[in-house]
Amino acid sequence: MRSDVIKKGLERAPHRSLLKALGITDDEMRRPFIGIVSSWNEIIPGHVHLDKVVEAVKAGVRMAGGVPFVFPTIGICDGIAMDHRGMKFSLPSRELIADSIEIVASGFPFDGLVFVPNCDKITPGMMMAMGRLNIPSVLISGGPMLAGRYNGRDIDLITVFEAVGGYKVGKVDEETLKAIEDLACPGAGSCAGLFTANTMNSLAEALGIAPRGNGTVPAVHAKRLRMAKEAGILVVELVKRDIKPRDIVTLDSFMNAVMVDLATGGSTNTVLHLKAIAESFGIDFDIKLFDELSRKIPHICNISPVGPYHIQDLDDAGGIYAVMKRLQENGLLKEDVMTIYLRKIGDLVREAKILNEDVIRPFDNPYHKEGGLGILFGNLAPEGAVAKLSGVPEKMMHHVGPAVVFEDGEEATKAILSGKIKKGDVVVIRYEGPKGGPGMREMLSPTSAIVGMGLAEDVALITDGRFSGGSHGAVIGHVSPEAAEGGPIGIVKDGDLIEIDFEKRTLNLLISDEEFERRMKEFTPLVKEVDSDYLRRYAFFVQSASKGATFRKP
């Protein structure tokens, strides 16, 4: 066993002595040592219950004959970090999470690992660490929050953000806003729609590294604790058989994950995260795969923020394995990839049942004929940009409008809420990329303001920043190269016409080639002052969004 390096031989008496200080017995020294990394804390709603999930994992490890050891990592709630300096640290925290786990699991040679995350950057950060370390591993998340209820309908955090915009234009009164605020988030779990956290936890199932139900079983259901025990049992079996993450996760696994992402209409952030995770697993993954597959995979699940359903409804309908059953029915699922169950995913999916034909529609009756995400290219995005196609209003699928340019998200939000943005405008927010922010903040407030102000069917927004999984509308993020790296988004001027064609996947600045070249030659990127040592280092090392916003290799 990997842990024998600290357990066996006379020379390891000091190591055993320290382990015995923890209460470890001689009998336990002969068993597999299982590390359990948890992002439990008392400030994130998605994490506040992870201590209970961890206790269930520990029970499962012991049931299977292993010895559990819990260690922590950090986490940030993007909702609480929104609209202030804290959002600059959200995406950068992903790299710290992966690094910190790699450090601990290298300093202590565990035989296996169980990863217990739940929210936006924590799940991908842990998956990156899993790929780097390549130790027998299972991921079990904390699960989604239940939707809130107000006035006879399900609501969630995005309802609150959009109600703020509604209040500004007199569509929502203060009493209603307060009621929505009080009821939207009823308890523990990752926010209830198909936002980034729930998308990533769902894709962990599709990759074969998490138990069935990982992405959809509600946080407060007892089934979540039973799944956590199962995760503890499974990891010990993987250790005994020496089955590592890279034995399970292949390019075909990523293709399954992308197809699930497209079919469900997942978060645009998955493009960033899957690219980064694939790199950690040593897999060459081109983001163009999203666009190639989106032409084949229809959008079949209408889940918040683009539809009326929530994650609990998807769970009731059969969950992610039922979505994969639709892929299997149409001959698209890569069936031969392995899973933590030591069974091929095709065999497991055959056992799944689709329990609601509207929540998980058949391919011949989709919500949209193409997948939920698209990659756009053009003179404004030579390395690509990302859009949530499932959230684009039909009348905005092709749009030409004048640019209204902002150098950060706050100024854009103020302009939108004060009525300065008119129908037909294209809001351009730049210097919000990985390097330029730094930190590639989410532009949830400006997009929610557009919706709340009643402009969602008339105004587009493009940015080198990113979006919350809760953003929807004619919005395009991850424009690459970013302005801070000399990208063409930096040469856009107020009043310039911008053409967006979601059908053709193009994003272009409508000026002459000569004018374009002249501006690019004269362009000097704005350099912002950065008041954080970590963010200065992050900005120095981070790569483009098209490369997953990972660090450059030394």
UniProtKB/Swiss-Prot annotation:
InterPro entries xrefs: Dihydro-acid_dehy_C (IPR042096), DihydroxyA_deHydtase (IPR004404), DiOHA_6PGluconate_deHydtase_CS (IPR020558), ILV_EDD_C (IPR056740), ILV_EDD_N (IPR000581), IlvD/EDD_N (IPR037237)
Residues annotated with N6-carboxylysine modification: 121
Reactions catalysed: (2R)-2,3-dihydroxy-3-methylbutanoate = 3-methyl-2-oxobutanoate + H2O; (2R,3R)-2,3-dihydroxy-3-methylpentanoate = (S)-3-methyl-2-oxopentanoate + H2O
Binding residue positions for Mg(2+): 78, 120-121, 442
Family matches, as Pfam families: ILV_EDD_C, ILVD_EDD_N
Molecular-function GO terms, alphabetical: 2 iron, 2 sulfur cluster binding; dihydroxy-acid dehydratase activity; magnesium ion binding
Xref: SUPFAM superfamilies: IlvD/EDD N-terminal domain-like, LeuD/IlvD-like
Cofactor(s) named in the record: [2Fe-2S] cluster; Mg(2+)
Keywords for this protein: 2Fe-2S, Amino-acid biosynthesis, Branched-chain amino acid biosynthesis, Iron, Iron-sulfur, Lyase, Magnesium, Metal-binding
Co-factor binding details: Binds 1 [2Fe-2S] cluster per subunit. This cluster acts as a Lewis acid cofactor.
Active site: 468 (proton acceptor)
GO annotations of cellular component type: cytosol
PANTHER family: D-XYLONATE DEHYDRATASE, D-XYLONATE DEHYDRATASE YAGF-RELATED
NCBIfam families the record matches: ilvD (TIGR00110), PRK00911.1 (NF002068)
Described purpose of this protein according to its UniProt entry: Functions in the biosynthesis of branched-chain amino acids. Catalyzes the dehydration of (2R,3R)-2,3-dihydroxy-3-methylpentanoate (2,3-dihydroxy-3-methylvalerate) into 2-oxo-3-methylpentanoate (2-oxo-3-methylvalerate) and of (2R)-2,3-dihydroxy-3-methylbutanoate (2,3-dihydroxyisovalerate) into 2-oxo-3-methylbutanoate (2-oxoisovalerate), the penultimate precursor to L-isoleucine and L-valine, respectively.
Family according to the record: Belongs to the IlvD/Edd family.
Protein name: Dihydroxy-acid dehydratase
Protein species of origin: Thermotoga sp. (strain RQ2)
Lineage, broadest ranks: Bacteria, Thermotogati, Thermotogota, Thermotogae, Thermotogales
Gene name in the database record: ilvD
